[in-house]
Amino acid sequence: MLAGARRLGLPRGGHLCWLLCAFTLKLCEAEAPVREEKLSVSTSTSPCWLVEEFVVTEECAPCSNFQIKSTPECGSTGYMEKITCSPSKRNEFRSCRSALMERHLFWKFEGTVVAVALVFACLVIIRQRQLDRKALEKVRKQIESI
């Protein structure tokens, strides 16, 4: 390359970085409207535990196969708890997250992170060996030319 010339564009791997950033932003934009819709539910049709004080009557327990298919509260997590609202004395169910499920999801996440780290560590080692071979080849050619 000439002394005054400079390289235009992104360095190697820069395109991949920008592509990853754009993809992540698209995912965030796709999830945002769903959250807004959930928050905009009117209070007249909302469950009593959103607007009143409540007492948990039955702790978080796994749903049966029938409940998962028939009860919307069971659909999202597979667990639900029974709640009694104090002022209106209404009994309702709400979805909940169990400690066992959270632990399982945590270890699944940790396993995925370790696996990805190992893959990238192997890629780094392979790339480093390639670069070392190229450097040794250049040095060998320089020594041979003397």
From Swiss-Prot:
Residues spanning the signal sequence: 1-30
Alphabetical keyword list:
Cell cycle, Cell division, Cytoplasm, Cytoskeleton, Membrane, Mitochondrion, Mitosis, Signal, Transmembrane, Transmembrane helix
Annotated membrane-spanning segments are: 106-126
Residue intervals annotated with topology Extracellular? 31-105
| Cited InterPro entries | JTB
The residues on the Cytoplasmic side of the membrane are: 127-146
GO biological processes: mitotic cell cycle; mitotic cytokinesis; positive regulation of protein kinase activity
Look up and give the membrane topology term: Single-pass type I membrane protein
Could you confirm whether the keyword rRNA processing appears in this record?
A: no
Q: Which Pfam families match?
A: JTB
Q: Which GO terms describe its cellular component?
A: centrosome; cytoplasm; membrane; midbody; mitochondrion; spindle
Entry's localization field? Membrane; Mitochondrion; Cytoplasm; Cytoplasm, Cytoskeleton, Microtubule organizing center, Centrosome
- Which molecular-function annotations from GO does this UniProt entry contain? protein kinase binding
Family membership: Belongs to the JTB family.
Q: What does this protein do?
A: Required for normal cytokinesis during mitosis. Plays a role in the regulation of cell proliferation. May be a component of the chromosomal passenger complex (CPC), a complex that acts as a key regulator of mitosis. The CPC complex has essential functions at the centromere in ensuring correct chromosome alignment and segregation and is required for chromatin-induced microtubule stabilization and spindle assembly.
Q: What is this protein called?
A: Protein JTB
Q: Which organism is it from?
A: Brugia malayi
The gene designation is JTB
